[in-house]
Amino acid sequence: MKPLTVRQREILDCIRRSVENEGFPPTIAEIARAIGVSSPHGVREQLRALERKGVIELIPSASRGIRLLARAEEPGLPLIGKVAAGRPLLTEAQVERYCQLGPELFEHKGDYLLRVQGMSMRDAGIIDGDLLVVQQAQEARSGQIVVVRLHDEVTVKRLRLEGALAYLEPANPEFSVIAVDPERQPLCIEGIVVGVIRTRVG
């Protein structure tokens, strides 16, 4: 099977969740709402692509005419390496490859992997070259390690919320805390770090 695109994986995950939670697949309109697109035409095109790749079967003239096939195994988590300034994280251009990870490895499910650049989170056990397992989220609790976009740059820091301010704290005394007033500058949380994979030792 050819690797799924980010959008196709998102749609496949949406179908799986509906089948697992509701007992039946979603409609095209429900998929469009779930992935944040306004046009059902684009969803239909992606569903046809998923059918060609052998992961679903489309049943004509049925509002919920989608059937998951046995080959619809997890394509793996997208691995994002160097992040281009100003670009959304989960675009096909940002994905290096897909990696298979057993769901039992981490307490919380990850949505993508992010390659660490730099040593600002060293004392939290995160070093240059590590792969972070990240769960997509737009909100986070104080104390969680988050992936955030600030000034079109993506960084990994521990979030501390205090009053109206948000502080992005490194885990290395050689780096400075970043104070953010969300009313003056946008702070976009991209996800919460739920695991770390060390890619080399020594």
From Swiss-Prot:
Function: Represses a number of genes involved in the response to DNA damage (SOS response), including recA and lexA. In the presence of single-stranded DNA, RecA interacts with LexA causing an autocatalytic cleavage which disrupts the DNA-binding part of LexA, leading to derepression of the SOS regulon and eventually DNA repair.
The protein's Enzyme Commission number: 3.4.21.88
Catalytic activity: Hydrolysis of Ala-|-Gly bond in repressor LexA
Family matches, as Pfam families: LexA_DNA_bind, Peptidase_S24
Originating species: Methylococcus capsulatus (strain ATCC 33009 / NCIMB 11132 / Bath)
PANTHER family, sorted: LEXA REPRESSOR (PTHR33516), LEXA REPRESSOR-RELATED (PTHR33516:SF2)
InterPro entries: LexA, LexA-like, LexA/Signal_pep-like_sf, LexA_DNA-bd_dom, LexA_repressor, Peptidase_S24_LexA, Peptidase_S24_S26A/B/C, WH-like_DNA-bd_sf
A single BP term in Gene Ontology: proteolysis
Keywords in alphabetical order: Autocatalytic cleavage, DNA damage, DNA repair, DNA replication, DNA-binding, Hydrolase, Repressor, SOS response, Transcription, Transcription regulation
The protein's name: LexA repressor
Site for Cleavage, residues: 85-86
Similarity section: Belongs to the peptidase S24 family.
CDD domains reported in the protein's UniProt record: S24_LexA-like
Active-site residues, as the UniProt record annotates them: 120 (for autocatalytic cleavage activity), 157 (for autocatalytic cleavage activity)
